[in-house]
């Protein structure tokens, strides 16, 4: 059923009109940067159902409020990104007491809360888009372990991500692709890691002045032999929705459909993005 939904989504988006470099409610990174001296602030709320956390053994529904991202345009081709969430609330519907770190859980009842891990990254646009070629960029990011093992929401690992970003407007369609490598720490052993391939493909089309419909498939694939360390296996989700831009503010909403047992069976996301001039580059 989920592959059919994805096929319908991608076919529908191929009717497109011009769309600008995209982000919320998607997570596939456009190679275009926000611009020198500009600041981008995005915030939103996610509600995701039937998530499985294999390290803590918890299954349930996750509320992320608010999700926050801030980007600083430090030059015409580079930006610094900071992303995270101030408050995560996980409503537990099932537990696996034999999960690797279930013995560390320290909360009462069927609800746990906590911060989310912080991600700090840098994006560089290497090649600008031209009529005969796509824009090409690179992104490097590090995930810092702010979420705790005791809440069941954190892995306690520091991860590194790097990806090649490609984007092209073809006639009226904005197509963005990501491909890269993530080095994920083993939450049960400090001397082990797992390398996974990351991927993303997004499309965007305008249906009216300042109104777009968007969609993507994004995730990661374990490339190793045997069972991966807990919490480092395959992930994936389809996202589709819309966004409305008025001046320097964009409002968005979307639907999330997970592709693996660890991802949500269904989710909703909504938020806004605001871009303004924050400083002058000397």
PLM regions with names:
Residues 1-6:
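Bacterial N-terminal signal peptides that target proteins for export
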Residues 16-18:
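N-terminal signal peptide c-region/cleavage motif recognized by signal peptidases
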Residues 21-282:
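Transmembrane beta-barrel domains of Gram-negative outer membranes and organellar outer membranes
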């Amino acid at each position: 059923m989920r592959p059919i939904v994805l096929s319908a989504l991608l076919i529908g988006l191929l009717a497109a009109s011009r769309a600008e470099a995209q982000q919320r409610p998607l997570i596939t990174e456009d190679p275009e940067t926000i611009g020198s001296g500009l600041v981008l602030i995005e915030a939103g709320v996610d509600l995701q159902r039937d998530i499985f956390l294999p390290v803590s053994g918890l299954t349930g529904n996750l509320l992320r409020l608010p999700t926050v991202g801030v980007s600083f345009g430090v030059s015409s081709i580079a930006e610094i990104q900071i992303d995270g969430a101030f408050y995560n609330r996980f409503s537990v519907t099932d537990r696996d007491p034999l999960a690797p770190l279930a013995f560390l859980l320290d909360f009462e009842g069927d609800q746990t809360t906590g911060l989310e891990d912080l991600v700090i990254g840098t994006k560089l646009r290497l090649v600008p888009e031209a009529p005969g070629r796509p824009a090409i960029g690179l992104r490097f990011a590090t995930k810092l372990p702010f979420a705790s093992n005791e809440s069941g929401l954190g892995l306690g690992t520091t991860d590194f991500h790097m990806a090649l970003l490609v984007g092209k407007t073809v006639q009226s369609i904005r197509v963005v692709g990501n491909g890269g490598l993530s080095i994920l720490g083993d939450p049960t052993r400090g001397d082990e890691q797992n390398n996974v391939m990351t991927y993303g493909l997004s499309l965007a089309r305008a249906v009216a002045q300042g109104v777009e419909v968007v969609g993507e498939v994004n995730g990661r694939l374990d490339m190793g032999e045997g069972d991966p360390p807990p919490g480092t296996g395959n992930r994936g989700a389809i996202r589709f929705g819309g966004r409305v831009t008025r001046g320097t503010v964009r409002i968005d909403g979307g639907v999330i459909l997970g592709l693996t047992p660890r991802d949500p069976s269904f989710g909703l996301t909504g938020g806004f993005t605001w871009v303004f001039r924050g400083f002058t580059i000397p």
